[in-house]
């Protein structure tokens, strides 16, 4: 496990402007399972997703207009991902606001996938404990008008993806000062990743998600209410 600069103290380690949500936001999909699926696109759903695995109490619902709510209390082996977003993903200004009160491992993050190459990526906005499942490699940091982020990569071997069970790379941008609400200009992160040698492929979907998961004896709990535009 690498030593993180601003993460060294950790263990192991939304915004309804206007009257209507954009047409690219949808509340039609609420896909829920109790075991890992074989195809992550089915698991994640698309524009709105709610996926769970293992034990624990994970309750998330789409409220319409780009808003979703979650409450969770995990146990060993449990986890969930829920969020609202866009398909395809890509360069855009994602505005969000709301509340996020979390304990244990998990994130409030913009989460997405690309193909060719197959990349799973996170832009992490807030968290309690970051407890990566795989070792992270630091790739640098960057600062712009929205804040300072540290960059990491990791690799997952023979895990579920939007292309079935595959080995793929994960990209991470992690804020040095946590926030809940603001604008995420995704293109700025894509550019910073590219300069660090982190090359994305063709964009599939992306969501502003709440995620919680158990890691050893560390268990997640909390609540969130997030609106995305």
How does the language model describe each region?
Residues 58-61, 65-73, 146, 150-152, ...:
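Generic recognition of long tandem-repeat/solenoid scaffolds
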Residues 81-104, 161-168, 186-207:
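Short, surface-exposed loop and linker segments with low hydrophobicity and enrichment for Pro/Ser/Thr
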């Amino acid at each position: 496990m690498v030593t993180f600069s601003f993460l060294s103290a950790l263990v192991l380690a939304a915004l309804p402007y206007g009257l209507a949500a954009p047409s690219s936001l949808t509340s039609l999909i609420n896909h829920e399972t109790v075991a890992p699926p074989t195809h992550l696109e089915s698991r994640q759903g698309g524009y709105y997703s709610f996926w769970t695995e293992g034990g624990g109490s994970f309750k998330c619902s789409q409220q319409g207009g780009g808003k979703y709510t979650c409450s969770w209390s995990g146990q060993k082996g449990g986890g969930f991902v829920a969020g609202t977003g866009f398909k395809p993903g890509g360069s855009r200004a994602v505005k969000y606001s709301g509340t996020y009160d979390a304990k244990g491992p998990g994130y409030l993050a913009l989460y997405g996938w690309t193909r060719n190459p197959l990349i799973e990526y996170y832009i992490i906005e807030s968290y309690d404990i970051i407890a990566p499942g795989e070792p992270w490699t630091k790739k640098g940091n960057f600062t712009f008008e929205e804040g300072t982020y540290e960059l990491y990569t990791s690799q997952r071997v023979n895990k579920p993806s939007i292309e079935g069970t595959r080995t793929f790379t994960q990209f991470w941008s992690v804020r040095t000062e946590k926030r809940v609400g603001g604008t995420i200009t995704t293109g700025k992160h894509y550019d910073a990743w590219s300069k660090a040698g982190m090359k994305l492929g063709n964009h599939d979907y992306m969501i502003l998600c709440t995620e919680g998961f158990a890691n050893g004896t560390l268990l997640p709990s909390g609540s969130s209410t997030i609106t995305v535009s």
